[in-house]
Amino acid sequence: MAYTWRALLLLALAFLGSSMAERDCRVSSFKVKENFDKNRYSGTWYAMAKKDPEGLFLQDNVVAQFTVDENGQMSATAKGRVRLFNNWDVCADMIGSFTDTEDPAKFKMKYWGVASFLQKGNDDHWVVDTDYDTYALHYSCRELNEDGTCADSYSFVFSRDPKGLPPEAQKIVRQRQIDLCLDRKYRVIVHNGFCS
């Protein structure tokens, strides 16, 4: 009898623990990098993995260059392979300008392609986490559901090294992907020199 009570108690505790561990997937609950320093963030970043949004998007060989001008304004250029009409691969150049918000890690990013067939828009650009020297995790939600979760998002895992992230950085990034409710939603980005 005592065994049955212990088993029921453990089952109840497990149920309580699992319900308390449910994630809050509302975009407003997502944390970003505290005390973000865009000057330290500037420089070259290689995209190692990405979660795609709806529509045409850079496929692979994605390299981004962030700069901060003398007035503190951040801008970026990115290059990567895009597949058009399901069979035509081209290297696309993208340009972005950033508007600061109250949170130093949250920006509005106006972007456009150098070629007219590329997308343009004005998306959120959040730096979720970075150590500035090894890894960075970017997130953008283009459209919210009524419940505050994201209907159309994209995200990049960046590395300063084109060969990838060290294991300790991979562990941090994986946890932050879970925090964004995007675990197992990313695909690896190859860097094979297509746009070199």
UniProtKB/Swiss-Prot annotation:
It is found in: Secreted. PROSITE patterns: LIPOCALIN. Coiled coil: none annotated. Transmembrane segments: none annotated. Substrate binds at Q119. GO terms for cellular component: clathrin-coated vesicle; extracellular exosome; extracellular space; yolk; yolk plasma. GO terms for biological process: eye development; gluconeogenesis; glucose homeostasis; maintenance of gastrointestinal epithelium; oocyte growth; positive regulation of insulin secretion; protein-containing complex assembly; response to estrogen. Disulfide bonds join C25-C181, C91-C195, C141-C150. The keyword Secreted applies. Keywords: Disulfide bond, Retinol-binding, Secreted, Signal, Transport, Vitamin A. Residues 1-21 form the signal peptide. GO terms for molecular function: protein domain specific binding; retinal binding; retinol binding; retinol transmembrane transporter activity; signaling receptor binding. It comes from the Eukaryota. Retinol-binding protein that mediates retinol transport in blood plasma. Delivers retinol from the liver stores to the peripheral tissues. Transfers the bound all-trans retinol to STRA6, that then facilitates retinol transport across the cell membrane. Interacts with TTR. Interaction with TTR prevents its loss by filtration through the kidney glomeruli. Interacts with STRA6. Belongs to the calycin superfamily. Lipocalin family. This is Retinol-binding protein 4. The gene is RBP4.
